[in-house]
Amino acid sequence: MQRTHQLFQQARELIPGGVNSPVRAFKGVGGEPIFFERGEGPYMWDVDGKRYVDYVCSWGPLVAGHADPEIVRRVQETAAKGLSFGTPVELEVEMARTLCQHVPSLEMVRLVNSGTEATMSALRLARGFTGRDKIVKFQGNYHGHVDALLAQAGSGALTLGVPGCPGVPEAVVAETLTVPYNDIEAVEQCFNEHGSEIAAVIVEPVAGNMNCVPPVPGFLEKLREVCDRTDALLIFDEVMTGFRVGPQCAQGRYGITPDLTCLGKVVGGGMPVGAFGGRREIMEGLAPTGGVYQAGTLSGNPVTMAAGLATLERITAPGAFEGLEQTTTRVVDGIKERADAAGIPLATNQAGSMFGLFFTDDAPVTRFEQVKACDLDAFNRFFHAMLDEGVYLAPAAFEAGFVSLAHDDNAVQETLDAAERAFARV
């Protein structure tokens, strides 16, 4: 790992922490982050030439795998015509049409450049539409680095938000209510106390930033019911789950239609992207047709649109997602079987092509408190053992894993063989 070490030393002199996103730093698992230079299919190669089976997939976007030939061809073809124009382009219309065709809640959509932009803009729009200020979010859910959503809960099941990091003023999060995820009773209590003041509820329909925790039966239904009852808007943050848990996203999988949806990751096929959309009457409140302002220099970038459209064609093709979900199940069940054989307590969750590994015997894992109580040291040992074996998992116990269409039988078997050896070392 000589070249990786050298690059990280250089990076730490020039970039805070040596990384451009904190989770990449390996702070949660220990050691130094690995620098990668190439990917193909389900594999990545680091700068020292070692190959890994990849279950991070760029934190979700690469549902077709690395350097898919058709996606690369479409990107190259589009880039040759110009990287950006700052004007409307045909590809953004095609992307908007594609999203509205596949995502049940979308009648109109606005394209942006990141998931954070999508959630930030959706909140502003919800407040503008309802004329209310309070936002409900859930413990363990992450919605980007939006000040109003970097709130943490205080003591008790239901509290007003307090800042979750330095630099976030108390006044900014004062209108943020934080409720335990998957706690139906707490949701009811929240709306009984504050329902007439709540502009919106924002939720990851499958929590992917407390590892991978699907909704318990009745949870999403309760959110829809209380929002309908109080005229609050329901916002699904599907930046991670969009086209990852089903070809119609989480809302199609679970049969609950939100008022607004935030998207990202897969929609850009590996390029920077975000999107938010919903009912026409709400979306027409955005400038220039309405008074809620939102803008972006590179929004609807043609190269991003090309990559995203090519990716969406792959994942929405007949039978594609079903095959991907079956592959994911083979990976998850295979790892669980090998943990059981080694006498290692391991709980697993899966939602489509997302999965979670929890070093605990407290199953099923449905609550953030359970996630925090897992054996983090065991996860860290397993992570490094798998890394040694050539399998790249998310370098944090609180992050979901991802499988791609490119993960074939060889990649799966290589992973399971590595897991068997790794559990012997844990």
UniProtKB/Swiss-Prot annotation:
EC assignment: 5.4.3.8
Keywords, ordered alphabetically: Cytoplasm, Isomerase, Porphyrin biosynthesis, Pyridoxal phosphate
Chain ranges passing through the membrane: none
Assembly description: Homodimer.
Family per record: Belongs to the class-III pyridoxal-phosphate-dependent aminotransferase family. HemL subfamily.
UniProt xrefs under HAMAP family: HemL_aminotrans_3
Name of this protein: Glutamate-1-semialdehyde 2,1-aminomutase
Species in which this protein is naturally found: Halorhodospira halophila (strain DSM 244 / SL1) (Ectothiorhodospira halophila (strain DSM 244 / SL1))
Native organism taxonomy: Bacteria, Pseudomonadati, Pseudomonadota, Gammaproteobacteria, Chromatiales
